[in-house]
């Protein structure tokens, strides 16, 4: 089963690759080539991108910044990533539009739901930047929100690990991977996949979440085709 309309959540860290900070052009190129394969299958793809490779609001808040101010700085970081991703996508021939939750008309369109859906219908990729435009909400929650708004069939969370585990697989060799689990299990066991607001939004709107490894070439197109390459939350 190939999904027809997908919301892909890319963390800022995914764009960082092995670098300690910023954007790795090779990773952007690899993601762009994968996205091209997806678009060629006539799949409608929207992307929400994080900003943790540049600035993380929670970290800024922990370091003494006002939380709302820190979150706004984080939103600007996501716009930088969105524009960089647009550049990478267009270099491989993928028509792309960036829409931001905070208006900045000189560099991106404002987020307008109907316009975003029209872009998708025309075969363009839409990259959402600026989070949801409000502090105190993560980009994972933005992904769940935008997925519900554009009627996406699935949220695909691209991460550094190949699915959801019962504990950190980088620290514990006996970590158990889940092939599937329920929203309720994630919420009740406080499994660190997404924040609880994002999980609850997906649960309330019956949008499944696929968690998979972004660094394995071809995984985006495999996930879109419904191949069991990660963990499915439903």
UniProtKB/Swiss-Prot annotation:
Coiled coil: none
A Gene Ontology molecular function term of the record: ATP binding
Key words, A-Z: ATP-binding, Cytoplasm, Kinase, Nucleotide-binding, Pyrimidine biosynthesis, Transferase
Annotated positions binding ATP: 9-12, 52, 56, 159, 165, 168
Residues noted as binding UMP in the record, renumbered to the chain: 51, 71, 132-139
Control of this protein's activity: Inhibited by UTP.
Catalysed conversion reaction: UMP + ATP = UDP + ADP
Entry's EC annotation: 2.7.4.22
Main subcellular location: cytoplasm
GO term, biological process aspect, one: 'de novo' CTP biosynthetic process
Keyword Isomerase included in the entry's annotation: no
Enzyme type, top EC level: transferase
Assembly, per entry: Homohexamer.
Protein name: Uridylate kinase
């Amino acid at each position: 089963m190939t999904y027809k309309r997908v919301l892909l959540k890319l963390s800022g860290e995914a764009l960082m690759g092995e670098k300690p900070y910023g954007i790795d052009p090779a990773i952007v190129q690899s993601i762009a080539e994968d996205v091209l394969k997806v678009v060629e299958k006539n799949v409608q793809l929207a992307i929400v991108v994080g900003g943790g490779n540049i600035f993380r609001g929670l970290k800024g808040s922990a370091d003494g910044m006002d939380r709302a101010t820190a979150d706004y700085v984080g939103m600007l970081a996501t716009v930088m990533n969105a524009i960089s991703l647009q550049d990478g996508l267009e270099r491989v021939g993928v028509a792309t539009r960036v829409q931001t939750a905070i208006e900045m008309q000189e560099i991106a369109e404002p987020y307008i739901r109907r316009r975003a859906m029209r872009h998708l219908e025309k075969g363009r990729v839409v990259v959402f930047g600026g989070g949801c435009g409000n502090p105190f909400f993560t980009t994972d929650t933005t992904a769940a929100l935008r997925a519900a708004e554009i009627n996406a069939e699935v949220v695909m969370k691209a991460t550094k690990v190949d699915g959801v585990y019962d504990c950190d697989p980088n620290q514990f060799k006996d970590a158990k991977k889940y092939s599937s689990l329920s929203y309720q299990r994630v919420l009740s066991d406080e499994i660190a996949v997404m924040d609880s607001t994002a999980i609850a939004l997906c649960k309330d709107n019956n949008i499944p979440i696929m968690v998979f490894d972004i660094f394995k070439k071809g995984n985006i197109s495999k996930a879109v085709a419904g191949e069991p390459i990660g963990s499915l939350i439903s």
